């Protein structure tokens, strides 16, 4: 029986990629800089203190993968851990450093075209676009129209939104159109309908995602984004390994978290919504228990990115990594003889880096299974090596990109 479990630690880069200069990200290192801050005692909070402690990930080769990526061992990680898995680091072939590009490339389909972007920091959106969205949604106006941090924009405009009923439109360095609305005063269903309208109107702009950003709270300083986020993505430009598994083997792909949204539902046969790392872990375990032959269980742990990377919260990121590491054996112990477990990321988001955007980094590729030989996989030229490996593992037709590391 063949089953693959893929865990994406969203934004957990392990060192600047070779083309980081194009993105202004030379020297970025999500893992290394978190470890450095922890080692210096600068990432202590109520949940953690001291050096970054990731014994289980280190046994899978994380520390060594980071060393191969950057040339140095991340501070505090165990250089002498007995390696029980295959480890490597992968460069991104895709043109961007965004979530869809990273995930699609993992599934064997790199993004070789350029996304559309709203580059202007202020007055970011064309008037003809927003006019059409407002007319179709029967709205009198909107707020924002700028690049913004998702939490700061709520403090800046949340109260006005509640008073006027006008949605908050904003973007970032990614190919995104984001809409924030209060779940109670505006309504979640109304927000999702508005986002669908925006998705349709953005067809000619080649924007990767429309993101619904619902929030709650009574006023400034009290607003919180909820777990009802929704990503409306374009479909991948070619068939992914997920779709091939379903079509060629009558297989199953169980999405946990936002995976289904990222692939616009393509190749997904079952989806489970869960919010927060603990709930995502629980849902993943339940899915593994129920998984049959020719199944992929695919989980995205978005909080590393959304709650800690973008928020530049080093201590929070470190605590979340240590929690993840502590629970990882629960999944490892569930693996049957022929199963494989792959841990990876989709891009970087260095919480010590200027700004609030993603960083162009290598991603870890950690592979574990009873039949997986331990040792280095080296530098992989594309994230698509993961997709090609899955194609070989499940004995389906080859992907166009990538080389298997099995």
Swiss-Prot record:
Isomerase that catalyzes the conversion of deoxy-ribose 1-phosphate (dRib-1-P) and ribose 1-phosphate (Rib-1-P) to deoxy-ribose 5-phosphate (dRib-5-P) and ribose 5-phosphate (Rib-5-P), respectively. Its EC number is 5.4.2.7. It comes from Aliivibrio salmonicida (strain LFI1238) (Vibrio salmonicida (strain LFI1238)). GO terms for biological process: 2-deoxyribose 1-phosphate catabolic process; 5-phosphoribose 1-diphosphate biosynthetic process; metabolic compound salvage; nucleotide metabolic process. Belongs to the phosphopentomutase family. InterPro entries: Alkaline_phosphatase_core_sf, DeoB, Metalloenzyme, Phosphopentomutase_DeoB_cap_sf. Its main location: cytoplasm. Mn(2+) 2 binds at residues 305, 310, 358. Pathway: Carbohydrate degradation; 2-deoxy-D-ribose 1-phosphate degradation; D-glyceraldehyde 3-phosphate and acetaldehyde from 2-deoxy-alpha-D-ribose 1-phosphate: step 1/2. Mn(2+) 1 binds at residues 10, 346-347. Keywords: Cytoplasm, Isomerase, Manganese, Metal-binding. Its cofactor is Mn(2+). GO terms for molecular function: magnesium ion binding; manganese ion binding; phosphopentomutase activity. One of its GO terms (cellular component) is cytosol. This is Phosphopentomutase. Binds 2 manganese ions. It catalyses: 2-deoxy-alpha-D-ribose 1-phosphate = 2-deoxy-D-ribose 5-phosphate; alpha-D-ribose 1-phosphate = D-ribose 5-phosphate. CDD domains: PPM. It comes from the Bacteria.
